[in-house]
Amino acid sequence: MGRGALILALAAATTAPMAGKPPAALISHDAFPGWPSDFEDHPLKPLPLTERESGYVRDFPGRVGRFSDGKREVVVRWVIEPTRRLHPSADCYQGLGYRIVPADSERDSAGRRWSAFHAIKGEQALHVRELIAGADGRTWSDISSWYWPAALGRAVGPWWAFTVAENQDTRAGKSE
C-alpha cells in the first residue's frame, strides 16, 4: 500500500465513528421544560446559585438549578448539547478544597446506576452521587461514559444531570 493510500485509510478509520448520526440536533434554550418540583418523592425548594455556579453557567449550553429537599442539596443541569463544560461533580468539590474518596456505585428505586463518592473538608463529610439521563430514557453514571455517545449522536438529548449531596451523618441515620 502506498503512503498516500495509507494516510487516506488512517484518516477514514479515525473519522469513521463520526460518520454515523450527526451530533445531537440543536435544541433551543426556549425548549426548557422547567425545573422538577420534586425529586425522589421529596419536594424541592429552589436555592440561589453560588457566585461560582453563576460564573459557570454563563457559557453553559443549558441551564443549572440548585435545590434542597430539606436534607439534601440537589444540583440539576439541563444540557442541550454535548459539552466538556459538563464535568464530574468530584472535580467541582475538589476545586472547592474537598478531599475526594471514591464510593461504590448505587442503584436507585428505578434500577438506575449512580456513581458516588465522599467529599471531605475539615469536619464536613458529604456523600455525593451523580447521574445523567437522556430524553430517550438511557442513563449514565458518569460524565465520561455519557460524553462520547452524546458527541457522536448516539445519545438523545436534551439530558438531565443530577448531583445529590447529603451529610454522611444524615445518611447514616437512614434505615437500610
Predicted regions span which residues?
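General structural signal for secondary-structure boundaries
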Residues: 1, 48-50, 170-171
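Internal/C-terminal transmembrane anchor helices
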Residues: 1-21
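Aromatic-capped interface at the extracytoplasmic side
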Residues: 19-30
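Surface-exposed amphipathic alpha-helical segments
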Residues: 156-176
